[in-house]
Curated annotation (Swiss-Prot):
PROSITE patterns: GLOBIN
Gene: HBAB
SUPFAM superfamilies: Globin-like (SSF46458)
GO biological process entries: hydrogen peroxide catabolic process
Keywords: Heme, Iron, Metal-binding, Oxygen transport, Transport
Protein name: Hemoglobin subunit alpha-B
Gene Ontology terms, MF aspect: haptoglobin binding; heme binding; iron ion binding; organic acid binding; oxygen binding; oxygen carrier activity; peroxidase activity
Gene Ontology CC: blood microparticle; haptoglobin-hemoglobin complex; hemoglobin complex
Record: residues binding heme b: 88
């Protein structure tokens, strides 16, 4: 999916608002995903999945850091996310549908925390961006 210059600008501006809260939002999105889509828990059998879990917070930070890296390298996400794509495709073997579920939960989380900034245009840009990230992460499944 090709991001327009406006999409890139919207994504960068939205991610600046996320700022230091990125790890917390990542953890909240994971909690939403585990509650809304319980089958996603199967990839985390060794985690304490309770609210406020240190393990969920740690993984939420990893998710947020990966998205921050994608924002910083929006024009070359395949290179920036190559190692992460390898990990998910070859070692973890995460079902690609789970990226879509997490993307939805991330968008809901961002909308809850930044309702004024979460305009329809920003929503569309973030959705396109996260779809692009998902495409990159699943590219090595083939």
């Amino acid at each position: 999916m090709v991001l327009s210059p406006t999409d890139k600008s919207n994504v960068k501006a939205a991610w600046e608002k996320v700022g230091a809260h990125a790890g917390d939002y990542g953890a909240e999105a994971l909690e939403r995903m585990f509650l809304s889509f319980p089958t996603t828990k199967t990839y985390f059998p060794h985690f304490d999945l309770s609210h406020g879990s240190t393990q969920v917070k740690g993984h939420g930070k990893k998710v947020a850091d990966a998205l921050t890296n994608a924002v910083l390298h929006v024009d070359d996400m395949p290179s920036a996310l190559s190692a992460l794509s390898d990990l998910h495709a070859h070692k973890l073997r995460v079902d690609p549908v789970n990226f879509k579920l997490l993307r939805h939960c991330l968008l809901v989380t961002l909308a809850c925390h930044h309702p004024a900034e979460f305009t329809p245009a920003v929503h569309a840009s973030l959705d396109k961006f996260m779809a692009s990230v998902s495409t990159v992460l699943t590219s090595k499944y083939r």
